[in-house]
Amino acid sequence: TRPKVVVTPESQTWQTVGKPEKKVDAVKLVQGKPAFTADMDARGMLYAKVLHSPHAHARIKKIDTSKAKELKGVAAVLTYQDIPRVVYSTAGQSDPIPGPLDTFSLDHKVRFVGDRVAFVAAESPEIAEKALSLIDVEYEILDSILDSRQAIDANAIRIHDEPEYVDFGDSNADKNLAAHIRIDIGDEKKGFAEADEIFEAEYEVPKVQQAHIEPHVCV
């Protein structure tokens, strides 16, 4: 038997649903009065900058931070050699698609353009930016993967070859597979057999964020 759809009658006691809500901070926002995280300036505060990789896939053969450390106003310069090597997941979701442990704060290998290479903390954003330009990095350029079909090819290079990698669910580093999920609704074979027309196509979707709630600034 097919499930019965029950429609809940509209409740007259609702105070918010279906009614306009006043934006209590609208006036202050248009006047520029509220202080956001990036507006805070504590006494003696340092400013951090990140050196990003220009390469999609490479190993760091050598990294020289001596000139950056000598720059006046620089408090610290960190590379993968200076911090604990702790693997973690950047995925915020859990089952049915848990993320594998495949990320390090800093690593001797970069896996995408923009990957983190070094951190700098300085007395001003300008000094920190200057320090980044003084860091000398020698890369061993590796073959890169720019297409998802290429990534899952049997002969594709392995992006995550680190021994610390931890699989979750159907993820598989050997196949460059971060996650896999299949959802079937109804009798698929019967549906195809009874269909008057069958349309086949491939669809590619960009990376999306449904709710922008994660912080992008911290003090």
Language-model features, listed with the residues they occupy:
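Extended, charged/glycine-rich binding lobes that contact polyanionic ligands
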Residues: V166-L177, I181, E188-E194
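Flexible, low-hydrophobicity surface segments
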Residues: T1-S171, I198-A201
